[in-house]
Each structure stands twice: as C-alpha cells, then as structure tokens.
From Swiss-Prot:
Lineage of origin: Bacteria, Bacillati, Bacillota, Bacilli, Bacillales
Gene3D superfamilies for this protein: HPr-like
Modification Phosphoserine occurs at: 46
Transcription recorded as keyword: no
NCBIfam families referenced in this protein's UniProt entry, alphabetically: PRK13782.1, PTS_HPr_family
Function (record text): Involved in carbon catabolite repression (CCR).
Alphabetized InterPro entries for the sequence: HPr (IPR050399), HPr-like (IPR000032), HPr-like_sf (IPR035895), PTS_HPr_Ser_P_site (IPR002114)
Annotated ranges, domain HPr: 1-84
Pfam families reported for this sequence: PTS-HPr
Protein name according to UniProt: HPr-like protein Crh
Keywords: Phosphoprotein
Homology family: Belongs to the HPr family.
Annotated source species: Halalkalibacterium halodurans (strain ATCC BAA-125 / DSM 18197 / FERM 7344 / JCM 9153 / C-125) (Bacillus halodurans)
Length: 84
C-alpha cells in the first residue's frame, strides 16, 4: 500500500470534467485507489464518490493505492492532480 498527501493544483479542482478524467485515469490501473479528504474516504474510480468530496484547487488530499501497479498508479495520478 502506498499513501501520499497531495495538494490539488488544478485550476478548477476535481470538479466535473477534471473529475471524470481523473476517474478515467484511475480506472486504467488494477490497484484499488482511494482518496481521503477531511476524514472521508472514497473509491477514486467512482465519479460520484469523487464529486461528493468537493475537492477544490488548493485542497490537500490523501491518495491511497494498493495492488500490483500501486506505484505506477500513484505516480500517474499525482502528476494529474498537480497539473496547473
């Protein structure tokens, strides 16, 4: 299991279109992927779960990956979240 705190640098945060693209990226991996914000943990492969966190730009989230490609998934998703 890999766990890392990440600051969301996307201009619009993880809302609507960026959230859909993030979920699409997360679904490329076989690992289980979760995002935690303010004590609430959701499946990062679920658009509804992700939207329920209301992640805005500048938010700090915890990204958790667990599985065969956990490291690769972590790196790809951090790169996505930290894009400005």
């Amino acid at each position: 299991m890999v766990e890392k705190q990440v600051e969301v640098k996307l201009k619009t945060g993880l809302q609507a279109r960026p959230a859909a693209l993030f979920v699409q990226e997360a679904n490329r991996f076989t690992s289980e992927i979760f995002i935690e914000k303010d004590g609430k943990k959701v499946n990062a492969k679920s658009i509804m779960g992700l939207m329920s966190l209301a992640i805005g730009s500048g938010s700090t989230i915890t990204l958790i990956t667990e599985g065969n490609d956990e490291q690769e998934a972590m790196e790809a998703l951090i790169a996505f979240i930290e894009k400005e």
